[in-house]
Amino acid sequence: MRAVLQRVTRATCTVEGTITGQTGPGLLILLGVAPTDTPEVACALAGKTAKLRIFNDEAGKMNRSVLDIGGGVLSISQFTLYADTRSGNRPSFIAAAPPDRARELYGAFNEALRAQGLEVSEGVFGAHMVLDLTNDGPVTITLDVP
């Protein structure tokens, strides 16, 4: 499972002109699921995400988590995180989990974030989404959990 975490002051997901998810200060998470991922992997990644100290304290040091700042999360499914571009000019996505499995584990990840005490807003799985965000920093972290 692979997550790209972006520290944001705000983020919004729109599908067909309708806002489907948004957050104020917190994290925009792009989540990719691999075929070998499990609910346990989703839970471990959610725990790491919730506790990762990438928000500044009073001294300007990255010493606070999204939980510590009372921030929210906008979670977006993103199979393209498993793109393979080693051969040719067109990416292959065979390293991504099949849609049914990815949907299940995307849901498990979001529920695990909620169990950590986070307010989680979601995109629409499999839809064409338009994301509007304001990066804070910018701070962008990639997490891979085997």
UniProtKB/Swiss-Prot annotation:
Q: Example GO biological process term?
A: D-amino acid catabolic process
Annotated GO molecular function terms are: D-tyrosyl-tRNA(Tyr) deacylase activity; Gly-tRNA(Ala) deacylase activity; Ser(Gly)-tRNA(Ala) hydrolase activity; tRNA binding
- What Pfam families does the record point to? Tyr_Deacylase
**Under which name does UniProt file this protein?**
D-aminoacyl-tRNA deacylase
Main enzyme class: hydrolase
The protein's UniProt keywords, in alphabetical order, are: Cytoplasm, Hydrolase, RNA-binding, tRNA-binding
- What remark about domains does the record contain? A Gly-cisPro motif from one monomer fits into the active site of the other monomer to allow specific chiral rejection of L-amino acids.
UniProt xrefs under HAMAP family:
Deacylase_Dtd (MF_00518)
Q: What is its EC number?
A: 3.1.1.96
The gene coding this protein = dtd
Q: State the similarity comment.
A: Belongs to the DTD family.
Q: What does this protein do?
A: An aminoacyl-tRNA editing enzyme that deacylates mischarged D-aminoacyl-tRNAs. Also deacylates mischarged glycyl-tRNA(Ala), protecting cells against glycine mischarging by AlaRS. Acts via tRNA-based rather than protein-based catalysis; rejects L-amino acids rather than detecting D-amino acids in the active site. By recycling D-aminoacyl-tRNA to D-amino acids and free tRNA molecules, this enzyme counteracts the toxicity associated with the formation of D-aminoacyl-tRNA entities in vivo and helps enforce protein L-homochirality.
Q: One cellular component GO annotation, for this chain's record?
A: cytoplasm
Report quaternary structure and partners.
Answer: Homodimer.
Q: Which domain of life is it from?
A: Bacteria
